[in-house]
Amino acid sequence: MAFLSHLQFGDNSTGIYSRVYTLVDCHLHFMRHYNHFRPDTDARCEKVEVVVEAPGKDDLNLQEWYLNNETQSGRVIFDLQSKTSSDTLQKLVEFEGARCYSFEEEYHINIQRRRYYRLSIVAEKITINDTAFKNLYASDEA
């Protein structure tokens, strides 16, 4: 089975994405506040951490997103493809109003692809397949 994943930036409503990065690693952090050993708030996706292969030296879009504190929309897409059939199992993580609050550049000496970017993202809304999570702390109104 082949496993392909990408970080894409663009318009989720139209499905048009202008920038695509190869995803190496992804962590979705979920949380809900609890009181007296019981949850007392709705679940929210607290943050998304991704590692992507660093693009060429002329593509500074990810650094500019971090430095300018702009909001972006896009998605993380995971494709699990079987070599024996044409079926594709897909998981989709869409984000709206996302900001990059942490940016790291990593260099690895002993592997084929040596340069990576690690991003931490917080978004006003994250939808995983058909389940939506709103993060009130990420919006400007909070």
Map each language-model feature to its residues.
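Glycine-rich, low-complexity intrinsically disordered segments
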Residues: 1-142
